[in-house]
């Protein structure tokens, strides 16, 4: 099977490439350092599996990239690499096209099993995070009302500028510098956006922005 590895740390890309290329049934055909490059590599190489880090640099979110790649290249199975810090994103990543996720510090044997599992079209879930995923599913199962709202009727022009930047992972200071406003202004707008849209977390905001097509690479 052909595999693309996307991670912003070169040492991780190199390490995983060595492990996978040692397998008779696996070949790493390309690597990528961010979400944008991952999309380009998948488009070029048409891999069977994309092994992708969820934590990407601002502007190139792993969640955003997952959604776009899954929509454009459904034949490529996406396996997410994650750390415990990313737990709140897991439900949203799986709902937006990933076939599974695995912890970065998982044993090599578990990584290989996860890759072969998603390659077959099955879902792989790291058992250490299953409880978090179930809890997130329960809390979100009846919480889709915000997704039906029209952002162009609810949000102000400035809020429509800020929302995509938040979703892409930019911090308050970076957004303030981009829009030439104060950090306090950005914080106030962020609060208003979450309140107006009925959102409770950043992953929900990212998913909302994706569904409303407010994000582009």
Swiss-Prot record:
Domain Response regulatory intervals: 2-119
PTM-bearing positions, type 4-aspartylphosphate: 53
UniProt-recorded Gene Ontology molecular function terms: DNA binding
UniProt PTM comment: Phosphorylated by NreB.
Biological-process GO terms, alphabetical: phosphorelay signal transduction system; regulation of DNA-templated transcription
Cell compartment(s), UniProt: Cytoplasm
DNA-binding region, residues: 172-191
One matching Pfam family: Response_reg
Keyword field: Activator, Cytoplasm, DNA-binding, Phosphoprotein, Transcription, Transcription regulation, Two-component regulatory system
Any single Gene Ontology cellular-component annotation: cytoplasm
Domain HTH luxR-type as annotated: residue spans: 148-213
Function: Member of the two-component regulatory system NreB/NreC involved in the control of dissimilatory nitrate/nitrite reduction in response to oxygen. Phosphorylated NreC binds to a GC-rich palindromic sequence at the promoters of the nitrate (narGHJI) and nitrite (nir) reductase operons, as well as the putative nitrate transporter gene narT, and activates their expression.
Name of the molecule in the record: Oxygen regulatory protein NreC
Organism field: Staphylococcus aureus (strain bovine RF122 / ET3-1)
Lineage of origin: Bacteria, Bacillati, Bacillota, Bacilli, Bacillales
